[in-house]
Amino acid sequence: MNKEQFDLNLVPTWRQGYRFQFEPAQNGFVILYPEGMIKLNESAGAIGQYIDGQQNVSAIIAQLKQKFGDISEIDQDVVDYMLVAKQQHWIDLV
């Protein structure tokens, strides 16, 4: 699915039982859940930092562009992350 097909007004929230945090022992961001832990790569960690249940996907993209520059791939990277995170049941999109 590309950016044009994805509703950028959806607001991502971490699902109950899932917690996003920086883990010093892993030297990176992780998602903790009752059955274990998922270590995120650097770009996934950067996106995850902006999932707060308040901002929609469009606002998250805007903040990442402000932080990293107007890189054209950011839009699609964020959409891809949201789709994978939803499929893996890490987040809800409302």
UniProtKB/Swiss-Prot annotation:
Which Gene3D superfamilies does the record cross-reference, listed alphabetically? Coenzyme PQQ synthesis protein D (PqqD)
InterPro entries linked to this entry? PQQD, PqqD_bac, PqqD_sf
Task: Indicate yes or no for the key word rRNA-binding.
Answer: no
- A Pfam family of the record is PqqD
- Pathways involved: Cofactor biosynthesis; pyrroloquinoline quinone biosynthesis
Q: Which domain of life does this protein belong to?
A: Bacteria
Entry's Gene Ontology BP terms? pyrroloquinoline quinone biosynthetic process
User: Single GO molecular-function term?
Assistant: quinone binding
Family according to the record: Belongs to the PqqD family.
Chain's role: Functions as a PqqA binding protein and presents PqqA to PqqE, in the pyrroloquinoline quinone (PQQ) biosynthetic pathway.
Q: Report quaternary structure and partners.
A: Monomer. Interacts with PqqE.
Identify the HAMAP family for this entry: PQQ_syn_PqqD
Listed name of the protein? PqqA binding protein
Give the organism, scientific name.
Answer: Acinetobacter calcoaceticus
Q: Which gene encodes it?
A: pqqD
